[in-house]
Amino acid sequence: MPDRCIARVMRAHGANAWVEVNAEAMVLAQLKGRSIEAITNDRVVLDRQTDPPQITEILERRNSLLRQEGHREKRLAANIDLALLILSGEPSFSPETTLRVMAGLVAQQIPFLLVVNKSDLDGPTQMALKSLSRIQPMPETAPEWPWILANTKQVNGLDALHQEIELNCPAVSSSESSSIALMGESGMGKSSLLNLLVPDANAQTQAISEALSSGRHTTTSSQAYRMPQAPGKRSLRLIDTPGFQRFGISHLDREDVASVFPEWSWLQQGGSCRFQDCAHLHEPGCVVQAAIKTAVDAGQLARANALEDKRILWERLLSSANAPDRRSTR
């Protein structure tokens, strides 16, 4: 066995990290030097000549999950092949927060699947689907964001989820697992999903916490788990990320935010806004505002309300991104 090898970070905690080499048991390693900062699912160079082993290098990341409020950045995980964004109607998820996460995922070129959880609860599920419709593209503008129903109470409650994972997570190479991130606001049922997908997750978390002497709950930092797979199935890694109430996007620009509002580019196919940097807020000659007025004048109130709702959500995201309000004074 070589003294230096490539390992995968399963959980990082300060100057320490649990790492996995191939499918071997995890080992506790230390970061070499203050300039090295590891996050969950990083690929790293591990020197096993020392005791404990040392992480000497972080290999290039294909992407990273992060949220940011001003100068405070929180990197959650790296090298993600699919993000599962968990929603529910009890408690109700926030359409605005969901759009924030989606914009962050699109900016990092991370495919995502919206999972409406707790689908065994009829009333809350209908409320969740109504909220989901607010963030779906208007039918004529773009395809729907991919979504499924799921629940942990019924025998077949996760069948659709397993099928989507099988379709959307091809192995990166013959020697690597695909990596799936589990994300969601607090209370969406993410932990229940995790415990079904990885039955020994609690035991793994407890062992790691005891070794790190952290005593921290599983949802305070990201942790990767190897998902049990039937013989012949591809290997998968599931990354549980901390639940959140807010999701900062000050690291995103206006184009990133616009990626989850395809209506704006579709509307401008018939004619551009007067100003190239139009923020679709109060500027004269704005095609978005014109479309809302046209719908009102034509008595198409449902369309007008849908566009105005989109515009309000857009304004909220834009004010939080690295994209100042560009109200023209020309």
Where do the PLM segments sit?
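A residue-level detector for short acidic-glycine micro-motifs
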Residues: 8-11, 57
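Beta-strand/loop nucleic-acid-binding surfaces
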Residues: 25-40
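SH3/SH3-like beta-barrel fold
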Residues: 17-21, 29, 46
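Helix-rich effector regions associated with P-loop NTPase G domains
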Residues: 3, 15, 38-52, 57-83, ...
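Conserved lysine of the Walker
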Residues: 190
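Phosphate-binding glycine-rich loops and their immediate beta-loop-alpha structural context
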Residues: 88-137
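Canonical P-loop GTPase G-domain recognition
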Residues: 120-186
